């Protein structure tokens, strides 16, 4: 039962944090590139890598990794924004967003794991 509570607590704070960051960027970003989701997902990849790489206890992994990072990052919004770029025929931004998210996300997850293991 405590495990579910840790995940739920982390998830609550992760979702609220993502909501606040997304709204902040949407008010300031006037480009077609979905910068808020991109930065959230890249930051989340790095932090999750760091959490796992640092060897924290299972409780902290559940709270921060599964809960907070699971709600903070958003694969579904990434896919929705990608489809919206395609529907608007904004092919160059679509390709940039898609490739940058995957490539930079993997690199940042690796970097986080390396730094977490120091």
UniProtKB/Swiss-Prot annotation:
Stretches that traverse the bilayer: 1-21, 33-53, 55-75, 93-113
Keyword Metal-binding: yes
One Gene Ontology term from the biological process aspect of the record: cellular detoxification of fluoride
CC annotations in GO: plasma membrane
Means of activity regulation: Na(+) is not transported, but it plays an essential structural role and its presence is essential for fluoride channel function.
Annotated membrane topology: Multi-pass membrane protein
Protein residues bound to Na(+): 70, 73
Leader sequence residues: none
Subcellular location: Cell membrane
Predominant localisation class: membrane
Keywords carried by this UniProt record: Cell membrane, Ion channel, Ion transport, Membrane, Metal-binding, Sodium, Transmembrane, Transmembrane helix, Transport
GO molecular function: fluoride channel activity; metal ion binding
Keyword Membrane listed: yes
Chemical reaction(s) catalysed: fluoride(in) = fluoride(out)
Function: Fluoride-specific ion channel. Important for reducing fluoride concentration in the cell, thus reducing its toxicity.
Sequence similarity: Belongs to the fluoride channel Fluc/FEX (TC 1.A.43) family.
Name the record gives this protein: Fluoride-specific ion channel FluC 2
Organism of origin: Bacillus cereus (strain ZK / E33L)
